[in-house]
A protein has these predicted regions:
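Conserved HGGG/HGGXW glycine-rich cap/lid loop of the alpha/beta-hydrolase fold
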Residues: 4-52
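Active-site signature of alpha/beta-hydrolase-fold catalytic machinery across serine-
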Residues: 29, 94-98
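Active-site loop/oxyanion-hole signature of alpha/beta-hydrolase fold enzymes
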Residues: 42-83
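Flexible "cap/lid" loop of the alpha/beta hydrolase fold
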Residues: 97, 103-135
Length: 263
């Protein structure tokens, strides 16, 4: 696990968590854009880092715990903006659960609103992983030209951005561990109260529409978050393909958080 830092001259700290099955390099352009305003820590997960090909992804709690250690040791546990996209929002939730940390603004972009299946039987878990992970690994992790076009259409992304983010050398076990340790885990909505929580979805893709399907139910239950839809964006494309627009949205959200703190 590595941490890449940009804009150290700025006082406010922004932590960025990329999605699953991809590497940190896809987030470099937006990290560099955000570094014009914030001190940015871009996280590179084990198992999906081309700079550390010998590593293996273990679990979401493991990634979150070590990130928490890093922030506590170097920055006293203070995060001004915590950002995660797609699978990275699972890591984000475990970071929110770390009581050592104080987080002002949290932005979950492309957050899946459904939990993994709650399966107790090890045999059924293995079957679930075989089909769920196997399909993702085949479709994304080992995508050829035809599958790449399909994924880009589903996600509303360009092929150039797909080539930049996907890490094709990740091991099968790293892909398995991404999903295995999420089985039976349920989102703790009380954690939303520990921060000023924002959930964003860009619904110009079939993938994102499915991920957002339970947002209305969350709103009806009164969970503490601010919701925003980007109708012309696909899955992760606001940050991945429009870094300047992304920066404006992040700054606006964070300013709202700071205003709320003053009330």
């Amino acid at each position: 696990m590595k941490y890449f830092e940009f804009g150290q001259e700025h006082p406010e700290l922004m932590v960025m968590l990329h999605g699953g099955g991809v590497c940190y390099r896809g987030a470099l352009p937006v990290a560099e854009e955000m570094a014009k305003t914030y001190h940015v820590v871009l996280v590179a997960y084990d198992g999906f880092n081309p700079d550390e090909p010998e590593t293996q992804f273990r679990s979401v709690p493991d990634e979150a715990r070590r990130l928490g250690d890093y922030i506590v040791e170097r920055y006293g546990g203070k995060i001004d903006i915590l950002y995660g996209v797609s699978y990275g929002t699972f890591v984000l939730m475990d970071v929110l659960a770390d009581k050592r940390l104080t987080i002002t603004t949290t932005i979950a972009n492309g957050m899946p609103t459904m939990d993994y299946a709650d399966i107790k039987s090890p045999v059924l878990q293995n079957l679930y992983i075989f089909f769920l992970t196997g399909f993702s690994y085949w479709l994304i992790g080992k995508a050829g030209p035809i599958r790449k076009k399909l994924v880009c259409k589903m996600m509303g992304r360009t092929e150039e951005s797909f080539d930049r983010i996907v890490y094709k050398d990740a091991t099968w076990q790293s892909w398995v561990n991404q999903d295995k340790y999420m089985i039976g885990r349920h989102r703790n909505f009380d954690l939303f109260k520990r921060t000023d929580m924002y959930i964003w979805h860009g619904i110009a893709s079939s993938t994102e529409k499915k991920l957002a399907k339970h947002v209305r139910a969350w709103q009806d239950k009164g969970y503490a978050f601010t919701y925003k839809v980007f109708p012309n964006m696909g899955h992760g494309t606001l940050a991945g393909e429009h870094p300047q627009d992304f920066s404006k949205e992040v700054q606006a959200a964070h300013q709202c958080s700071l205003q709320k703190e003053k009330r």
